[in-house]
Regions:
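C-terminal edge-of-domain segments
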Residues: 162-179
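Short, low-complexity, polybasic intrinsically disordered segments
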Residues: 131-135, 165
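Short acidic capping loops at alpha-helix termini that bridge into adjacent secondary structure
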Residues: 145-148
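Short, positively charged and aromatic/hydrophobic N-terminal segments
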Residues: 6, 11-17
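Pyridoxal 5′-phosphate
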Residues: 151-155
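Glycine-rich, mobile lid/loop segments that gate access to catalytic sites or pores
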Residues: 138
Length: 179
């Protein structure tokens, strides 16, 4: 913006930082196939179902989407970069441990989580009975108030892979603030 004047070496970004709180928004998405006989873990909570997620880790699509949103907000890559599925130490790992590590990384960069919003899409089972437990578990793992954690569930009205009960997806949005 040519009409703004800055001291030598100063930038518009410096001006914004000096006047406003630094906030960051991140978006994450994950999907896993479902298969008979596996555990279904969502938001760190085991949900009774005949099918579970096929994955290298425990397959918690919600936590994976949240991790990607957190990492994306600070341009730190994605969950696959930080925890590659080619590394045997992550085989079957509890995704809450991955989330905890991502949250610690975010904090080490000087940011805190203002809030998260996550939507899980699958046809069955109905997730409403588990939502409060999921919110509480995520709040505990991330060290934030449960009021700052929103988890929603939806079906796709029998459309797509979720509707055919072939898989589950999750989308997450996070807001980070400079601590």
């Amino acid at each position: 913006m040519p009409w703004l004047c800055y001291a030598a070496g100063a930038t518009l970004n410096d001006d914004i930082k000096s006047r406003y709180m630094d906030i960051r928004v991140g978006c994450g998405y994950d999907v896993h196939a479902l298969a008979e006989g596996l555990r279904l873990v969502l938001c760190g909570v085991e949900v009774p179902h005949t099918k579970g997620c096929v994955a290298h880790s425990d397959g918690d699509v919600a936590i994976h989407a949240i991790c990607d949103a957190l990492l994306g907000a600070l341009a730190l890559g994605d969950i696959g970069k930080l925890f590659p599925d080619s590394d045997a130490k992550y085989k079957g790992i509890d995704s809450t441990l991955l989330l905890n590590e991502v949250v610690e990384l975010i904090r080490s960069k000087g940011y805190s989580i203002n809030n998260i919003d996550c939507t899980i899409a699958m046809q069955r089972p109905k997730l409403r009975p588990y939502i409060d437990t999921m919110r509480a578990r995520l709040a505990e793992v991330m060290g934030i108030a449960v009021e700052r954690v929103s988890i929603k569930a939806t079906t796709t009205e029998h459309l797509g892979f979720e509707g055919r009960e072939e898989g589950v997806s999750a989308t997450a949005v996070v807001l980070l603030i400079e601590a």
